[in-house]
Amino acid sequence: MSQNLESVKNLLVFLGKSLLSVLEALLFHVISKPRKNVAGEIVLITGAGSGLGRLLALQFARLGAVLVLWDVNKEANDETHQLAREAGAARVHAYTCDCSRREEVYRVADQVKKEVGDVSILINNAGIVTGRNFLDCPDDLMEKSFDVNFKAHLWMYKAFLPAMIANNHGHLVCISSSAGLIGVNGLSDYCASKFAALGFAESMFIETLAKKQWGIKTTIVCPFFIKTGMFEGCTTKCPTLLPILDPEYAVRKIIDAILQEQLYLYMPKFLYFIVFLKSILPIKTGILIADYLGVFHMTEGFTGQKKKT
């Protein structure tokens, strides 16, 4: 009898907490969730030399964060450093680092800890795309894609998570992709690496919860194509439902998600619906929807980022 009462009690507590969490979510759809203050926080951004990484750096500069900029391209990263100073950042530190190389990550991470301090917001943003069909993609390019888009996240967490745990304070941000949610023709290696990055970030979120490390937050970002040049030549058949995203808009949404400690951010919002449909519809129906949205052909014109001359 006592065991049955305990089971009923646990069920009622579970239902009560579930109801409260749903009501809280509904409330924050009506009013904006409070945003945390990141002034003085040490924010490390990989791939800060261009595109999304640079724009994120400039936004955090305006918010008063201490910036740690990593990029494999020293010249581009130095340019971001200068722009961040002009945007009002009090302290900016730029480091040249190839995040695909584990030992280099650990070496530069040690340098950051000595020269700047404990990183409290880590944004794994660096990424590359080959844009080739699987059988046309050289093995070394596929390996590089995995090294940058996924394995670098492992080394970055290994380097900076221990201090976050010790301080019970930190925020882990994974820039994944809509290609980490749904397979895309012509992006097999990219999709695989982004699926892996998302799965890893989600697993680490669960791990921090299981260990009651409440002060460590996670945000996982899955955007559709962004006009940064990385996916130059890619198209969308349905721009109303799946628009190619403006970089400034994307960065504003990412910053808001971080400041509100939002776990998942999909852009555009239609992606939430697509992921839901993928889980419940028959496969033939899903294929029809993908065909209607032009998913099979959106990368056929891919040219990728043009190198500056």
From Swiss-Prot:
Record field: catalytic activity: all-trans-retinol--[retinol-binding protein] + NAD(+) = all-trans-retinal--[retinol-binding protein] + NADH + H(+)
Metabolic or biological pathway, per its Swiss-Prot or TrEMBL entry: Cofactor metabolism; retinol metabolism
InterPro entries reported for this sequence: NAD(P)-bd_dom_sf, SDR_fam
This protein's UniProt keywords: Endoplasmic reticulum, Membrane, NAD, NADP, Oxidoreductase, Transmembrane, Transmembrane helix
Gene Ontology CC terms, in alphabetical order: chromatin; endoplasmic reticulum membrane; nucleus; plasma membrane; transcription repressor complex
One GO term (biological process): negative regulation of transcription by RNA polymerase II
E.C. numbers: 1.1.1.105
Active site: Y190
Coiled-coil intervals, chain numbering: none
Membrane topology: Multi-pass membrane protein
Function: Oxidoreductase with strong preference for NAD. Active in both the oxidative and reductive directions. Oxidizes all-trans-retinol in all-trans-retinaldehyde. No activity was detected with 11-cis-retinol or 11-cis-retinaldehyde as substrates with either NAD(+)/NADH or NADP(+)/NADPH.
Similarity annotation: Belongs to the short-chain dehydrogenases/reductases (SDR) family.
Annotated protein name in UniProt: Epidermal retinol dehydrogenase 2
Organism, as annotated: Mus musculus
